[in-house]
Amino acid sequence: MSPLLPTHWGASAPQNEPTLPSPSHSVSTRVGDEEKLRRSEGSDGEDRINLDSNKYDVKGMKETEDGGANKQVMVVFEQKSGKELEKPIEEGPFTQPRWRHSLPFVKPKHPPPPPPLSLDDAPVTPEVSANFFNLLFFNWISPMMALGSARPLQDADLWRMDAARGAKPLSEKLLASYAARTKKANEYNARLADPNTPLPFSRRILYSVLPHREQREKDYRKKHGKKHASLAMSLLDVFGWFFMSAGFIKVFGDTCQAVTPLVIRRLINWSANYQAAKSAGLDLPSRGPGIGAAIGLLLLLICSSLGMHHYFIRSMGTGVLSRAAIISAVYQQALQFTQKSRGQIPNGKLVNHISTDTSRIDFAAGFSHMLWTAPVQMIVIIIILIVQIGYSALPGIAFLLVMTPLQARFMKTLFMFRKKAATWTDKRAKLLQEILGGMRIVKYMAWEKPFLERIHAIRSMELKYIRLLLIFRSGMTAIAMSLPILAAILSFITYSLTSHSLEAAKIFTVITLFNLMRMPLMMWPMTLSSTADALNALGRLEAVFDAELVKEEKKVDPSMDVAIRLENASFTWDSAPIEEDNMMSKLTGKYAKVLNGGKPGGPPGKKEKKNKPKKVTAAEEIQAETAAGQPGAGEASAEGQGQKNPSAPGIDEEISEKKEVEIFQLRDINLNIPKGSLTAIVGAIGSGKSSLLQGLMGEMRRTTGSVTFSGSTSLCAQTPWIQNATVRENILFGQPWDEERYWAAIRDSSLEADLELLEDGDGTEIGEKGINLSGGQKQRVNIARAIYYNADIIALDDPLSALDAGVGKAIFFNAIINALSGKTRVLVTHALHLLPYVDNIIMMEDGKIGEVGTYRELKERNGAFAKLIKEFGNEELAEEKMETEEEAVESSGPTVTHDRANMMSKGSAHTLMQTEERNVGALKKGTFFDYLKAGKGVFMLPLLFFCIVVAQSFYVITSFWLVWWEETKWPQPNGFYMGIYAGLGVGLAIALFFQGFSNALINYFASVNIHHNAISRVMLAPQTFFDTTPLGRIMNRFSKDTDTIDNTLSDAMRMAISTLANIVGSVILLAIIEPYFLIAMAVVSLLYLHNAMFYRRSSREFKRIDSILRSSLYSHFSESLSGVATIRSYGETARFFEDNIHRVDIENRAYYLTIVNQRWLGLRLDFLGSLLSFSVAIIVVCSSSVSASNGGLGLSTIVSVQQAFSWLVRQIAEVENDMVGAERIMHYANELEQESPHQIEGTKPPASWPSEGTIEFKDVRMRYRPELPDVLKGLTLNVGASEKIGVVGRTGAGKSSIMVALFRMSELSHGFIKIDGVDVSKVGLNDLRSGISIIPQDPLLFSGTLRSNIDPFNTKTDAELYDTLRRSHLIGSSDSSHNSDSQNRFNLDTVIEEEGGNLSVGERSLVSLARALVRNTKVLVLDEATASVDLETDAKIQETIRQEFRDRTLLCIAHRLKTILAYDRILVMSDGQVAEFDTPENLFLSGGIFTEMCSKANISLADIKAAAALRF
């Protein structure tokens, strides 16, 4: 081994320890004047550091090779000139922080060293090489804590886990164990199903005496007797000995603790004998035995503490590693999900599994051994009690035993509440995942507030069970705290009634024993609760482990004479059942009303009363989870979807008949695709073109036959999957850098002009889902990736449809024909005019191959293909013309020569995705105040304080009452003392309940208000927030952080407050007994405070780093799962799995150190607490003024609370750590930037606004973010009522920015926009966006039904909605409702999957058109709405626009000149300004840019005049 850091840092790493890839990390620190670096030329010619030279920046540290096997740690300095220098760390002006430097009078001479340059350079944890002493006392983490005390820790500072505890080997073991257990269970179930296999002996005996034996045996074989693999047992297989040994260590610690009362008895007996001898004037006994007993007490307490903390490090360590193994295994499983599994377990649920469920398993692992050690500890204490006071202890013990079933009943109820709460948590997470992922369309449609109401409704149901959980936990805690006192009361009363006299030694030994029961009694219910939560979570996770996976890898045969061979292959899409949840029916009152979306648009007529608009129930709205669909197969959407359709006015009754779900299938596919050929797949909508491609790629279930490839594959999907990474990283996609191949791919995919426009060229960061790229740019990046990947076989799923026709033509010839020549290309396309250039054509008909051949062969056959060509012959010519038109539009400027330097990263761009906010140091000022304010602290804190004072008063008086009873302070009978003692105990129990209840209410109100405010502000945040913040980060706030404030923070605060109250009460009691105790308390308190402050500086940074790394993990998890089809088609599953493993391991560095430094602190604070107990024992031995009774009371009190001192510090730290999560979500709740008001009452426009549709832009300037340049630069134009305006211009000219400005997605920096004379900046955003409509370029749908997507808040009748479906061509225009419904795949209850995954792009565009028809506004914007659809869909959309929007004002941002020639005026944009604006005729005659466009597109004045005759 060679040290990566100096030995005094305590870190060394084996040379063969593998390093993990990670992003670069650097931190700069300015060195002071005394550490200036000097460089001078040495005699040996080597450069030396010169301390007299200019200042340098310390960039970080790295490990370098020094002559072979030896390694050396170098500090990297950067000179002002940019030159980097390296220097061994031993020679640097740094002082490695140590514990002593945290003392106020010991300061290091130099600053601490900087962090390593990257995560790769972090050393392996020194735990693996630490000696026994350092492991025993956790000294190995001290250097890290000292560094954290000296400066804020960075992620690169944190040690790597050793390879054996990496996520990869652990997840592999877990999956292997679960698979083995599943196999064993299946074998047992198979044997059990055989009637010849005898049932287990116990069942045979039981059923022989019960009626209906045969039926019982049958049920047992089919259902009750079946076994199922257990994930909990699989985890035990992986962590068996390490985890189980923790329990035995705890038993050792508990045994030491249970013996302490016997030592206390010896001390009290010695004190009583000493006092008696002193009173009688006899020789005083030697103090030696007393001091010896005090030392014995100290040693027992230290051993007990060591046992407890080493128990926790093993059990909690198991939790950390279990979480890592489960997350990695879940990710690996999810990457292999079949379509059916993805439908049953959507991404939102998976994110909830890895955030909430794994956290509950992790938490439970730390305490689960208490399920059996607590009863063992109780039994040992009970035996000692019986030995001490005989059978008088039995009533108290019996009371405890009677109360145990009550606790178990409470736990069962808690388990039920937790399960119900988790169900609603899943629903909330799923809804949030979809809404936040589609916020752009939500804002365009002004749906923020209605969706907010849905979220609040679900949250209210979730909080209903959380509230009950908090109340029950308060009750259980009060019972657990009170049980020892009430049991002691019963035992003492019995002891007194049986004619025994109370003796100090017996009293306080028994009290100490009963007090020792408090912790197991208090922890056991919590352990039961957490175990119940964990078992529930494990049960939910088992669905992931049991999910159906893609069973086989692609079959590759390089020797095959063809590229792809399909033999008798049939494929089918899976149908995922709609999730049913009876709990949804329990939404009543306002929640049901909210989820129903309010009242319908208008009351039905008298004849329509029986046919009222269907009110969408909560179950239908929220439960519309993935169902009966075929993601990825646009044409193959489910027909009917099996939903019952309500009858409606004007709709034939037969529409409402329930229809069977029709699953799309490809049948009997036999196909050979030659190597190096270009094969096109064509066919009508719904024929199975994309399905065939998905079947080839393994995304569609193959039911029969075989598919064989001759080489590697890649997929260019119709909807491109773009990662949150740079343009270059998206194109490379994990492949090695090859400069020439890379720039060739850029050129062939027509990305050169785009890279020059981007601020940082190919180093520009792309947001999630390619948010800052246009649809065409995303598709070109997608194509460039396929070209660069250099696979043998490339599947292209209609990639040209998203491109301008001119660009599409260029890419077809430059990329598909030329650059990929020699590769096997399979192209799905609707561009019929390109077919003469392909080698082979496959004609799909109704899920079968209709014809195969060359273009000429198929035309000559006069079959289906010839019919298709004949039917769309004119449109084929039109398509070629469109290409010329669009090429003219895009090339309407000077010819540009592309400079590679302009396309490369310059390293100076603004980062799109904002770095996650991280406060350094203590919690942000006001965090606790804001939390308490949210928790209604003004009212609740006084109530809580009052309950604490009352409870502690009862505690102190109850403790002293025993002393007074033993001393017979008042001449009263025993009944007097017994009655008051019992009353005090009951009063204490009641006070403790109200104390816990008050605390629970504060946490409940805080949870309600923080989440409400946070999601409200997020929903009303500007669009730039969603463009620059990863969805995974936002979801982390509303999953893990919300779970923290709902549950973890509540428990931590309750424990901290109750512990603090107990300590205060105990200190008051001890001060009354012996005031000198306060001196020892003051000294120890200073040491407590110093250790706590030393701990907190590193603890909070561990937590914050962990939170940030966890968000990164969740973001990667969500992002990669959304692109699983692309990942699998490229064969990159292993790389993404390794990336996820790396992220889990990186996060575990911070998380594991958080656990260890808690143990470091706990052990030291327990030692200080043991010293306090020792000091009380010495006071009892050495002080003559302390009576035996008071000494016994003091000893029993300090022993029972000595661990409470360390527990308090840990709980306060835990509260602070958990408050980090609250701080993060409160940042959203209080500080998140907001859009302009959505409602402005004083300037609310009339309900009919806009009624005319006039639009005026005056000197409009706009930028997307403050740090970016203007994209609109003084735009001025006027649009008349019902005028149709076509907008054209090159990419980046500002076309779409007009729409952004009109909808106020970004606010203007200058000028104004008026609609019907109303300045849009003066009206609320909701009024503005509700008054105008949009058909966006990328139509986004939400999971649910077709009804919920076009009329999500139930404002229209069924008749109106069916009429809309006809007008938007989603169903036929036949007069017969029955025919139109039965002959089309759509009805109002057709299930729509997440993001409309089971519809084609064209079908999604038609749904978007239907939305616009339902909204029926005076102003409509089409943002390149037909750019990504086929000719047939384009024709339908244009026909609907012409017929339905005659009297509407229309702004059409167009690619194709043909689509806007019939418009009233044409707006030509250039560089954010109006270049030309007039009628098509006048612009053509003006000889400007538009004339040039028309000339290049071969459009004549006659064409324009002909189009003018067709104007709206």
Swiss-Prot record:
GO molecular function, one term: ABC-type transporter activity
Keyword Nucleotide-binding carried by entry: yes
Protein topology in the membrane: Multi-pass membrane protein
Membrane spanning residue stretches: 229-249, 288-308, 363-385, 475-495, 507-527, 937-957, 974-994, 1067-1087, 1167-1187
Consequence of gene loss (knockout): Abnormal extracellular vesicle size. Decreases the rate of non-lytic exocytosis in macrophages. Decreases melanin secretion. Decreases virulence in a wax moth model of infection.
Positions with biased composition (Basic and acidic residues): 31-65
SUPFAM superfamilies to which the protein is assigned, alphabetical: ABC transporter transmembrane region, P-loop containing nucleoside triphosphate hydrolases
Compartments, as annotated in UniProt: Extracellular vesicle membrane; Secreted
GO terms, biological process: biological process involved in interaction with host
Sequence ranges of Polar residues compositional bias: 13-29
Comp. bias regions, Low complexity: 619-643
Renumbered residue ranges of the record's region Disordered: 1-68, 594-656
Keywords: ATP-binding, Membrane, Nucleotide-binding, Secreted, Translocase, Transmembrane, Transmembrane helix, Transport, Virulence
Residues in ABC transmembrane type-1 domain copies: 246-533, 943-1217
Domain spans labelled ABC transporter: 651-871, 1255-1496
Protein family membership: Belongs to the ABC transporter superfamily. ABCC family. Conjugate transporter (TC 3.A.1.208) subfamily.
The protein, known as: ATP-dependent permease YOR1
